[in-house]
Amino acid sequence: EKAVGNHPFCVILPDDFIHAQHNHNVSRLVEAFQETGCSQLCVMSVNGPDISKYGVVEPGKRSNQVYRLVEKPSLEMAPSKIASIGRYVFTNSIFESIKSIGVGHGGELQLADAIDRLARNGKVEMVLLEGSRFDCGTERGYLNAILNLADRRKRVRENTLEKDIPILEASKYDKVLDMVDENFFTEKTF
């Protein structure tokens, strides 16, 4: 709070890796903030039970308005398929919101709860993600990011993946990812 003072600021969560042809998602958030003065969330559509891994937006009446943000709801309780991901622009009002919330999901202070409080005052909007998002906060997600990005780079694909891991070409990673379980990344593996 002392570092940013009264200035708006960006928050980028490091376990959300975003790959886009033009890396401008944060710029789009900043531009939207400059137009409206509202805090901004980067969002994406999530189908099925994976929605319970995210803060989920209940859209407001205005275009791009966030009415509510619900932290990790069940599929049945999710207000939409719009998930907040780790890119934000906030005004300094987020700090008062954080101070006013109690312990939330998982017994921790949740940024989503603070955002929800701001949203209920009509001060939060959303910008749709452009590109692909990878959850590098899990071993499986991290491996998925590595394999997908390597496959996009012709030189890496030709010199490594197609020679050393030929199963990838036929399966598009599913077989490799299915071989990965919670024990794959233990010290015994290496």
Give, region by region, the residue ranges found by the protein language model.
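Short, well-ordered turn and helix-capping elements at secondary-structure junctions
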Residues: M44, V70-P73
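Short glycine/serine/proline-enriched coil/turn segments at secondary-structure junctions
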Residues: G48-D50, E76-P79
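A short, flexible beta-alpha/helix-coil linker loop
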Residues: D16, L75-E76
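A short linear-motif detector with a strong N-terminal bias
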Residues: H19-H22, Q34-C38, V66-L69, H105-G106, ...
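Conserved beta-loop-beta/alpha segment of the NTase-like Rossmann-fold superfamily
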Residues: E1-P59, F90-N92, S97-I101
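Conserved alpha/beta core of the MobA/IspD/sugar-nucleotide pyrophosphorylase nucleotidyltransferase superfamily
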Residues: N6-P8, P59-Q65, K72, P79-F185, ...
